[in-house]
Amino acid sequence: MKYTFLAVLSAVTVLATPAPVPTPPNIPSASTAQSLLSGLTVRPQGPQDGYSRDKFPHWITISGTCNTRETVLRRDGTNVQVDGSCAATSGSWFSPYDGATWTAASDVDIDHVVPLSNAWKSGAASWTTSQRQSFANDLSNPQLIAVTDNVNQAKGDQGPESWKPPLQSYWCTYSRMWIKVKSVYDLSVTSAEKSALTSMLNTC
């Protein structure tokens, strides 16, 4: 099958044909996600006071010389080659948020699906540093995913009530990931956040 190139922006190529979508682990079905959402505590966000990314130690060593970022790059990429320090030297990465494919690891961010700041304001402020480190480096749940860097930066610490992936076709998966993480870590949701997640689940 021939690929039709729609655009070339710097190192990115957007493909007309579907690319394999990376699948972080432990994404629930839509029906399970709906049940999990119903079980989440609904309350206003807590204060930002005291928050710092440093309170969520991230990109820790996972295996050998590979840290969390490098591990996710290898998991979510295709034909990824690394050097002796585990830095990706070649490969390609499809970003399911916007449908772009990148060939330089420097153009890819590892997104915390539930942002650290959001977690802080919905329960993580009371956690120990060890608990926050586990959250920030969680490879067992759908909390980390490789995506286009500027899309991740546009998301910032926003919840689904104010930011959704540009590709509407990914809203179903994104909402299921978000809900799973909130459920695993017993984090609260706001009423607007719950409403947005419900609407996104309705696209499944």
From Swiss-Prot:
Please indicate if the UniProt record lists Secreted as a keyword.
yes
- The primary location reported for this protein is secreted
Per UniProt, subcellular location reads as: Secreted
List the record's Gene Ontology CC terms alphabetically: extracellular region
User: Would I find Acetylation among this entry's keywords?
Assistant: no
Q: Which InterPro entries match?
A: GmrSD_C
> What are the protein's UniProt keywords?
Secreted, Signal
Task: Give the signal sequence positions.
Answer: 1-16
**PANTHER family named in the record:** AMP-DEPENDENT SYNTHETASE_LIGASE DOMAIN-CONTAINING PROTEIN-RELATED, SECRETED PROTEIN
Task: Identify this protein by name.
Answer: Uncharacterized secreted protein ARB_06907
Q: Source organism lineage?
A: Eukaryota, Fungi, Dikarya, Ascomycota, Pezizomycotina
